[in-house]
Regions:
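Short glycine-rich His-centered loop
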Residues: 27-46
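Short, flexible hinge/linker loops that cap or flank conserved catalytic cores
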Residues: 22-24
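Conserved catalytic motifs of the protein kinase core domain
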Residues: 3, 27, 191
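Short, small-residue-biased leader/transition segments that mark boundaries at the very start
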Residues: 1-8
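Active-site-proximal helix/loop segments of hydrolytic enzymes
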Residues: 11, 15-20, 51-246
């Protein structure tokens, strides 16, 4: 990406102050969604998506539990529970979250070398678009700083479902308001929300970096620090959290 090392959030051609969400006082209620589970395995490759998302979500929840600034919530009663996106959105909304992160893994056809990180915030025109887009930028910046290649425009993209139920991927430079729905979880939850594609489970190098046991811990730490930055809190040190990424 040309100029990808620039802080995306500092780009403002109008000269206006960068957007910052209004967050109130802690503790903050943060909902973590393991994107697949139960009878829904997700994508299979070097690692299985549901195992990767469960491992990452569990570690992220642990980090949030150890930080008094946060109350972690979940969209499933257990990682082995089968639940549709609509059911998970409903369970999340019942708990009045202030932010939601849905963790997924990407995949590609046999022979593809596709790799990298991308994430999807609530689309333009939705109530929580600005907050979601801001959080998505934090996630992408954190992943890039830890060695992930960012896909698309700065790792932040939009998804729309067309009439034939086909998905249309749109870069985040396209800010026009559209009627088509995006991911159900993003549309139906009552808070800012981002769906993150952590890595390609079908790419050995990608899966080793962010889909292995240590890779999931690394990604969880990145997500935790992005959550802290979103709410303006100081993250606990890795030593206090009982985690070393070395």
């Amino acid at each position: 990406l040309v100029g990808s090392e620039m802080c995306i959030r500092d780009r403002n051609e109008s000269g206006e102050e960068p957007f910052r969400p209004v967050v109130g006082d802690p503790p903050y209620r943060v909902c973590i969604d393991a994107g697949h589970g139960g009878s829904d395995p997700g994508a299979r490759g070097v690692v299985e998506e549901k195992n990767m998302t469960a491992a990452t979500a569990a570690e992220l929840i642990r980090l949030l539990q150890q930080d008094a600034n946060f109350i972690p919530l979940q969209t499933r009663n257990s990682f082995d529970e089968t639940a549709t996106p609509a059911q998970r959105a409903a369970q999340a909304s019942e708990q009045s979250p202030q932010l939601l992160l849905s963790i997924h893994g990407n995949s590609a056809a046999n022979g593809s070398t596709a790799s990298g990180f991308e994430c999807y915030p609530s689309v333009p025109g939705r109530t929580w678009h600005q907050e979601s887009f801001y959080f998505a930028q934090l996630l992408a910046e954190g992943m890039q700083a830890s060695g992930a290649a960012l896909r698309g425009h700065g790792g932040v993209r939009y998804i729309y479902y067309l009439e034939n139920d086909q998905k249309q991927l749109v870069e985040s430079t396209h800010t026009e308001i559209r009627e088509e729905r995006s991911f159900t979880l993003l549309e139906d939850v009552n808070c800012p929300a981002v769906l993150a594609e952590q890595c390609f489970v079908t790419n050995e190098a990608d899966a080793a970096r962010f889909g292995s046991e240590e890779g999931c811990k690394k990604a969880a730490r990145i997500y935790y620090e992005a959550i802290c930055e979103y709410f303006g809190t100081q993250p606990q040190s890795e030593q206090l959290a009982g985690l070393s990424l070395n």
